[in-house]
């Protein structure tokens, strides 16, 4: 029983360490990467270049899945776009 609990605890720890995030990727000025309908492949490329698992155009900006924690994503509370 202790082995099973230890195994489950290890799996939970691995999930915390390998955690990733989803969101709108931002460029150097803090603005979202703009896109238009039909540019899913472009957004997917941009997301995977930032080590995300995938991405698509959630018009009007690129939404990425599985981004590492060090990649900055858009945060409406700390929006610095154009400022």
From Swiss-Prot:
Alphabetical list of SUPFAM superfamilies matching this protein: Scorpion toxin-like
Tissue expression notes: Expressed by the venom gland.
Keywords: Amidation, Antibiotic, Antimicrobial, Disulfide bond, Ion channel impairing toxin, Neurotoxin, Secreted, Signal, Toxin, Voltage-gated sodium channel impairing toxin
UniProt function note: Inhibits the sodium currents (Nav) in an apparent irreversible manner. Produces small depolarization and induces repetitive firing in squid axons. Is specific for arthropods (crickets, triatomides, crabs and squids), but is non-toxic to mice. Shows antibacterial activity against both Gram-positive and Gram-negative bacteria.
Disulfide links within the chain: 31-81, 35-57, 43-62, 47-64
Domain text: Has the structural arrangement of an alpha-helix connected to antiparallel beta-sheets by disulfide bonds (CS-alpha/beta).
SMART domains in UniProt: Knot1
Residue numbers bearing the Cysteine amide modification: 81
Domain of life: Eukaryota
GO biological process annotation, one example: defense response to bacterium
Protein name: Toxin TdNa5
Molecular functions (GO terms): sodium channel inhibitor activity; toxin activity
């Amino acid at each position: 029983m202790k082995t099973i609990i230890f195994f489950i605890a290890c799996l939970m720890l691995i999930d915390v360490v390998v955690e990733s995030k989803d969101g709108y990727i931002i460029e150097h000025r803090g603005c979202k990467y703009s896109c238009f309908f039909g540019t899913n492949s472009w957004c997917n490329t941009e997301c995977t270049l930032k080590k995300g698992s995938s991405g698509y155009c959630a018009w009007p900006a690129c939404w990425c899945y599985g981004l590492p924690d060090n990649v900055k994503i858009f945060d409406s509370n700390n929006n610095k776009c154009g400022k």
